[in-house]
């Protein structure tokens, strides 16, 4: 297995979270590199996209495929790229060892969403059910994989 790289992105609205998750990633001592993307790091064709004018999703997440693709291009084959949302929290636990071992055999590691997330009501959602947060085609795609 090659290098292990963690990447995250945030605009000004989530700048504190980006800094926090970068610190958490470094403190884990697992990643060879921690790459924190901001709008200034994006290629011009993404920065100039009309979608980037919207606050929602930092520009309706138009940046996400670009951030992942650009990072993949910068590293050698066999590098493990771990994309995380800047708003999540990285726990310091033994799971990281397990996940690293799994990545030696599989190209992709996905995590199952739990329907009941007690603290989500503070975000104003009337429901934490995944159907309210995810496109139907995405749900159907991953249902076929299980």
PLM region spans:
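Glycosyltransferase catalytic domains, chiefly GT-A lineage
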Residues: 1-146
């Amino acid at each position: 297995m090659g290098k292990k790289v963690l990447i995250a992105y945030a605009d000004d609205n989530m700048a504190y979270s980006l800094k926090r998750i970068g610190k958490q990633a470094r403190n884990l001592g697992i990643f060879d590199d921690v790459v924190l993307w901001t709008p200034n790091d994006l290629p011009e064709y993404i920065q100039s996209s009309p979608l980037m004018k919207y606050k929602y999703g930092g520009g309706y997440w138009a940046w996400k495929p670009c951030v992942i693709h650009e990072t993949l291009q910068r590293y050698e084959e066999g590098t493990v790229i771990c994309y995380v949302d800047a708003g999540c929290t990285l726990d310091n636990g033994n799971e990281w060892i397990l996940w690293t071992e799994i990545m030696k055999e599989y190209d992709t590691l996905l995590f199952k969403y739990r329907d009941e997330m007690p603290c989500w009501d503070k975000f104003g959602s009337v429901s934490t059910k995944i159907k309210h947060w995810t496109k139907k085609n995405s749900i159907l795609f991953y249902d076929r994989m299980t």
